[in-house]
Amino acid sequence: MEKFIAELEQCRLAELEAYLKATGLSNTTLSSDEENALNAFNGKNSGGNTPCGLTWQSFKLGDLFEVLSSKKIYRANTIKIHDTQIENSYPYVVRAATNNGIKGFIIDDPIFANEKNTLSFAQDTFTVFYQKQPYFTGNKVKILKPKFAFKSPKILHFISAILQFILKPLIWGLGSTTESIAEFKFSLPLKPTAKTQTLKDIDFHFMRTFINALMKQTIQGVVQYSNAKMQATKEAISQEAPTQKDSLF
């Protein structure tokens, strides 16, 4: 029984290590920078700047991204879509609001795949997702290619969350064009030392650090839940384990 419990614990630890590796984290302990980022966003220890104790500035989407058309449009009723990724396949991104907009995976010449480390922008549903792999798209999906130097996917996670929030009130069928997408305005945090309000003053370091902190907090919650389940399993096994009785002979 002890061996069985030990195997369960090893399995749990292996899953945690795999998740940490996938997210690029080595542990779930918040660094001082990450704690400061959370405090700043929550308005703690701030100098009164708003919102969230940070200085924010409005930018046009076109200031930070090139708004590009997909290299090729794939219609779902004319292609073979795989539920899981197989060899030589790439994500097929559509206007869905879940699973990063990925409907499945398709195989075609990679020359038609859009660049990885970009954002997909659904024109009718106004959903925005970070895409970590090269990908194909369905109809009415634009590609947002960063004009700034790409340093971390976490920065694009931060920006996509901001865009998703401000675009949420827009309704299906409203429509959009390359030009109108480039004109969308949204706010980003500025560096504490910023004296101007230009692209070079955007605090990309804060964005990356803040997302890191959120990921660690999420994993901490999963670990606590997993620990509670493990303890409950141990107790259940202990109660069900047969008690050895004295021999009759």
Regions found by a protein language model. Give the residues of each.
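Non-catalytic DNA-recognition/assembly elements of restriction-modification systems
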Residues: 2-99, 194-249
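A general structural signal for short secondary-structure boundary/capping elements
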Residues: 33-37, 137-143, 165-169, 188-192, ...
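DNA target-recognition domains and sequence-specific DNA-contacting regions of bacterial/archaeal
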Residues: 57, 62-186
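A cross-kingdom feature marking solvent-exposed beta-strand/loop segments within repeated
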Residues: 169-205, 220
